[in-house]
Amino acid sequence: KTMRVAVYCRLARADQNDTLLEVQKERLRVYAKERGYDIVAEIAEIGSGLSLNRPGIREMAGLAHRHMIDAVLVSDISRLCRDCGQTLRLEGKLKKQGVSIESMKGNPLPEYRRARIALGCIIK
């Protein structure tokens, strides 16, 4: 079965070079093609990474809820959110829908979990 993916790209500010979004997208397209993934959606937005309350994240969640994707591809996990607790909550919500997060730079989520446990925080 071919993995269906949503490519997610984000820039923090509109005054950043617009081509950076295209560069992120193109790198993710190549990454997906090399692995034989089927790109179902490309989501690109400009906004702060401090919160998950963004249209692109809602679009991604909708695709997951409708079982249209198997994974979300990002160039770096920080493109999703800069807050590790919120990133783990997003990962949990996606996982319940059978959707994983795949980063071109590797997966720091286990380190995020260890940090949260060390701080005595529980993610529901």
How would you describe each model-predicted region?
Residues 1-124:
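Short, structured surface patches at the beginning of a domain
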